[in-house]
Regions:
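Active-site clefts of carbohydrate-active enzymes
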Residues: 63-65, 102, 172, 176, ...
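Aromatic-rich peripheral "rim/lid" segments of glycoside hydrolase catalytic domains that contact
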Residues: 249, 253, 258-339, 351
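Aromatic-lined carbohydrate-recognition surfaces of secreted/lumenal glycan-active proteins
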Residues: 122-149, 213-228, 254-264
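Active-site groove signature of glycoside hydrolases
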Residues: 80-110, 133-141, 220
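Alpha-helical scaffolding within the catalytic cores
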Residues: 2-5, 36-51, 74-81, 141-156, ...
Length: 398
């Protein structure tokens, strides 16, 4: 969101296209798709369509927004008003703020960037109390030091934020696509799982200290090992090893990570983009690894079942992905089914869970085929099961 810049709201690589660009961050402002809301904008396009789809599917929006620190409070209030209808929103403002690659760091001092985060966090939450802000900084990057990176400037952001975050890549090729990650190169890095884990934990401990000993949710808003450095097999191995460590240590100080990302033109994705067709992804070994991890008990969402039966009709409440009320319907299967369908008469918007598999029913959809719940976990005889039904917002907005 750089509304004061020439060329706005066009994407930087389009309105500032130049043969002289040799690095992803060489444009006047950050080369992401632009935020079309804000002062004088609207919520018809992106990212708002994405946000509606995410909430229709029962998840919470985690929005990363780079913002020119020179914008006025009026701009921030307009952003807050954009976000008010979207329930719990995690807003990551000017992420990786102790770095030097994003445009906001190139046009402001670290002190100014930190001051802006505190101001933006305060103003946006005043006008949109559903928003939780995320401070994303380097944290502890050198294990021999007690203080975090740029602590003098950014200590104030720790109590101002609702959620703490560090972006950690166990391997990363930031020179992509302009060069190749080869031995001796200076546009990529590779660390270890143990080192990444320890830096993340030490960052949390330092953040807690700077918050007067009171903890807040600790996340990694970006996490992966770049297959462009490691190759696809060791990428999967490193992701598995990190998650094994979280589970083995029962790391309840750690709240979440965002795997970056689902599909990538390089080799960061669970899928890589098919170079012949950008609409198609090619699954990587880490996709199966990630699928196995999120189905472990330690990483699965918890559901509490109330005793007794309810009297229909009932109202299904959806607050966010960790706070909702649904229906549990007992089912008896004589054997592994040949067909398993749910048929609906109403234009409801539902998330359904059966045998550990989630299904989405959009408004207008009449039949949901749930046989996929048994492809990988077939029944070997009679079984009593439970169909769980939740009703997120049908429009994606409150």
């Amino acid at each position: 969101y750089y509304p004061l810049d020439e060329g706005w709201p066009g994407r930087a690589s389009v309105v500032h296209a130049s043969p002289d660009v040799s690095f992803a961050w060489d444009f006047p402002y950050d080369d992401y798709f632009t935020y079309k809301g804000g002062l004088g904008g609207n919520t018809d396009g992106e990212p708002f369509q994405y946000m509606r789809e995410i909430r229709q599917h029962g998840q919470d929006v985690s929005l990363t927004l780079t913002i020119d620190p020179h914008v006025t409070d009026e701009h921030l209030i307009a952003i807050a008003n954009d976000l008010r209808p979207f329930g719990r929103v995690f807003l990551r403002i000017n992420h990786e703020a102790t770095g030097n690659w994003f445009s906001f760091n190139k046009r402001c001092t670290y002190q100014e960037v930190a001051d802006f985060f505190v101001r933006a966090s305060r103003v946006i939450k005043e006008h949109a109390p559903n928003v939780q802000t995320i401070i994303c900084i380097g944290g502890i990057e050198d294990l021999s030091k007690e203080e975090m990176e740029k602590e003098a400037e950014f200590a104030q952001t720790i109590p101002a934020a609702d959620i703490w975050s560090v972006d950690k890549y166990m391997a990363l090729h930031w020179g992509w696509p302009y060069d190749v990650a080869e031995h001796g190169g200076d546009t990529h890095s590779r660390g270890t799982v143990a080192d990444t884990y320890e830096k993340t934990k030490r960052s949390f401990e330092r953040f807690r200290y700077l918050n007067g000993g009171t903890p807040k949710p600790m996340t990694m808003a970006e996490f992966n090992a770049d297959g462009d450095v490691t190759g696809p097999y060791e990428q999967a191995d490193m992701v598995r090893e990190f998650c094994d460590k979280l589970e083995q240590e029962q790391a309840d100080w750690f709240s979440a990570f965002t795997f970056y990302q689902f599909r990538d033109r390089g080799r960061l994705g669970l899928e890589i983009e098919d170079p012949n067709n950008s609409e198609v992804g090619i699954a990587q070994p880490v996709l199966d690894t990630y699928k196995e991890i999120i189905h472990r008990d330690w990483f699965r969402p918890q559901m509490e079942k109330q005793e007794g039966e309810v009297q229909l009709p009932v109202t299904l409440r959806w607050t966010n992905s960790e706070d909702a009320e649904g229906l549990a319907m007992p089912l008896h299967f004589e054997k592994n089914p040949t067909f398993c369908e749910a048929v609906f008469e109403e234009d409801s918007n539902l998330m359904l869970e059966l045998n550990g598999r989630w299904f989405y029913k959009a408004p207008g959809t009449k039949t949901v085929d749930m046989m996929a719940a048994f492809f990988e976990k077939p029944l070997d005889g009679p079984a009593d099961m439970t169909l769980k039904i939740f009703a997120p917002t049908a429009t994606g907005e409150n």
